[in-house]
Swiss-Prot record:
The keyword Cytoplasm applies. The gene is apt. CDD domains: PRTases_typeI (cd06223). InterPro entries: Ade_phspho_trans, Adenine_PRTase, PRibTrfase_dom, PRTase-like. This is Adenine phosphoribosyltransferase. Pfam families: Pribosyltran.
C-alpha cells in the first residue's frame, strides 16, 4: 500500500495558497497506520536509540507508537506553556514573528541517542528548534524522521546543512 495515497490534501488551508497535507486520513486507516509505524521501526531497529522525541501534536501519535515498538521512552516537545514543571525552551522564526517549543529539563540525559519524529517537515523551523533542545540537554540527534517531506520548502535541506540526518517516508511537491 502506498501511504502517500492515504494522505488527504486540503487546498487553501489554513490560508490561501497552502496545500495542507492531512494525515488524519492515514491515521484512521489501520493498515496505513501500521505500515507507517512498521516502516519507521524497521529503519531504527538495531540502531542505538534511547528515546523518541515527538513534536506537538501529530508527532506524538506516531512517535509514541514507534517508541513503544522500539522499547524506549517517548518525550514530547510542546508549544510554549503546555508542559508543567521545569522546562527548557527555544524560540524559532515563523513567516511573521516567532514561536517557541519546550521540553522538560529532565527529559533527555547526557549522551542519549534520540530519534526526532514529526508528521511533516516544511521549512524546518520547529524540527531545528526541537533538535537544539535535545542537544542543549546533552542528547545526540540520531536522525530527524518525518512521515511527509515537502522538498520545495527546503526544511530537510536546511536540517542537513546544519548537520542533522533526515528521513521522510514520502514526499509531496508543491504541484501535487
Amino acid at each position: 500500500m502506498n501511504i502517500k495515497s492515504l494522505i488527504r490534501t486540503i487546498p487553501d488551508y489554513p490560508k490561501p495558497g497552502i496545500q495542507f497535507r492531512d494525515i488524519t486520513t492515514l491515521l484512521k486507516d489501520a493498515s496505513g497506520l501500521r505500515q507507517v509505524v512498521d516502516a519507521l521501526v524497521e529503519r531504527y531497529a538495531g540502531a542505538k536509540v534511547d528515546k523518541v522525541v515527538g513534536i506537538e501534536s501529530r508527532g506524538f501519535i506516531v512517535g509514541a507508537a514507534v517508541a513503544y515498538e522500539l522499547g524506549v521512552g517517548f518525550v514530547p516537545v510542546r508549544k510554549k506553556g503546555k508542559l508543567p514543571g521545569d522546562v527548557l525552551g527555544h524560540d524559532y522564526a515563523l513567516e511573521y514573528g516567532t514561536d517557541r517549543v519546550e521540553i522538560h529539563s529532565d527529559a533527555i540525559s547526557p549522551d542519549e541517542h534520540v530519534l526526532l519524529l514529526d508528521d511533516l517537515i516544511a521549512t524546518g523551523g520547529t524540527a531545528e528548534a526541537a533538535a537544539i533542545l535535545i542537544e542543549k540537554l546533552g542528547g545526540h540527534v540520531l536522525e530527524c524522521a518525518f512521515i511527509i517531506g515537502l522538498p520545495d520548502l527546503g526544511g530537510e535541506r536546511k536540517l542537513r546543512v546544519l548537520g542533522y540526518k533526515t528521513f521522510s517516508l514520502c514526499q509531496f511537491e508543491d504541484s501535487e
